[in-house]
């Protein structure tokens, strides 16, 4: 493909909001059961559209749990074709690796690829499953070298394992009388400064959003009949960009990736870092 778009460092593409885990405080409301799987043909068409507008160094295929998508191999292959020079990353919790036995071969074939595995359970039985799955899918195949803490490399594939149950987790929203609410610190600069996902614009249903948390606000509020909630009103006014948006509008968006936005007020200004609470595991036998 030709006619590259504006250069950015990172771009996430959310191919599904379905997940086999429910992690308390998930940055994109996934723990509240939002089932959606984008059609493969739409993903390819949308990526091709956005390539003409954005030229990322790093593209992350994410969910939900992206391995739930039946065409995940093809999605990774197409992502490489379209974003030809970018690192192509897939972000997973590793529970479904046995159902995707060719994932390592696909990643080696596309090259310049990365797997990010995030562990969300302290339960030894679940941790054993994750470790076994990682060994069978990756570590047992090829020669891996430790390149940094929790990161190994084999040929042109990088595997990084993180564990938020050990710390560094915080609640992107708060619960008031059993209802999910935005934070009310009203300090978007501080919220942006302390945010863990502040430089990761994301494509969701073919719209480009500043960050993962804002991308799912309307989806969550619609499902829970909260569109009239006054506390969420400022954030419902935010709209993602379409791939045919005005060039100046997109340039403004790109510049703002590294700056706070008024929508940053929905997240805490001074988040309290903590170990992530145990994720609810769905449909996994132990």
Stretch-by-stretch model annotation:
Residues 1-34, 236-244, 260, 270-286:
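N-terminal pre-core extensions flanking Radical SAM catalytic domains
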Residues 1-92, 97-102:
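Conserved alpha-helical substructure of the radical SAM core
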Residues 6-14, 178-184, 244-257:
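Short, intrinsically disordered, charge-biased short linear motifs at domain edges
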Residues 38-43, 71, 126-129, 187, ...:
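Soluble or luminal CAZymes and related metallo-dependent hydrolases
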Residues 69-205, 209-210, 214:
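Conserved AdoMet/S-adenosylmethionine-binding subsite of the radical SAM
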Residues 150-171, 213-274:
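C-terminal accessory region of radical SAM enzymes
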């Amino acid at each position: 493909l030709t006619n590259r778009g504006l250069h950015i460092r990172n771009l996430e593409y959310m191919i599904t909001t379905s997940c086999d885990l429910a992690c308390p405080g998930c940055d994109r409301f996934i723990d509240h059961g939002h089932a959606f799987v984008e059609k493969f043909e739409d993903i390819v068409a949308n990526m091709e559209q956005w390539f003409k507008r954005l030229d990322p160094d790093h593209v992350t295929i994410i969910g939900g749990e992206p391995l739930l998508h039946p065409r995940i191999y093809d999605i990774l292959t197409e992502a490489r074709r379209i974003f030809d020079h970018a690192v192509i990353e897939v972000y997973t919790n590793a529970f479904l690796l046995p159902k995707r036995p060719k994932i390592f071969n696909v990643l080696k074939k596309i090259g310049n690829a990365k797997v990010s595995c995030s562990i969300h359970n302290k339960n030894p039985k679940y941790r054993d499953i994750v470790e076994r799955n990682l060994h069978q899918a990756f570590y047992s195949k090829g020669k891996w070298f430790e390149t940094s803490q929790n990161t190994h490399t084999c040929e042109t594939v990088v595997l990084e394992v993180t564990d938020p149950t050990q710390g560094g987790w915080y609640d992107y929203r708060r619960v008031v009388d059993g209802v999910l609410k935005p934070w009310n610190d009203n300090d978007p600069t501080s919220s942006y400064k302390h945010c863990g996902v502040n430089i990761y614009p994301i494509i969701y249903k073919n719209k480009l959003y500043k960050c993962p948390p804002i991308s799912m606000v309307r989806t969550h509020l619609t499902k829970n009949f909260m569109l009239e909630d006054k506390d969420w009103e400022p954030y419902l006014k935010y709209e993602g960009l379409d791939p045919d948006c005005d060039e100046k509008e997109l340039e403004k968006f790109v510049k703002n990736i590294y700056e706070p936005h008024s929508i940053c007020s929905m997240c805490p200004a001074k988040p309290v870092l903590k170990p992530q609470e145990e994720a609810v595991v769905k449909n996994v036998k132990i």
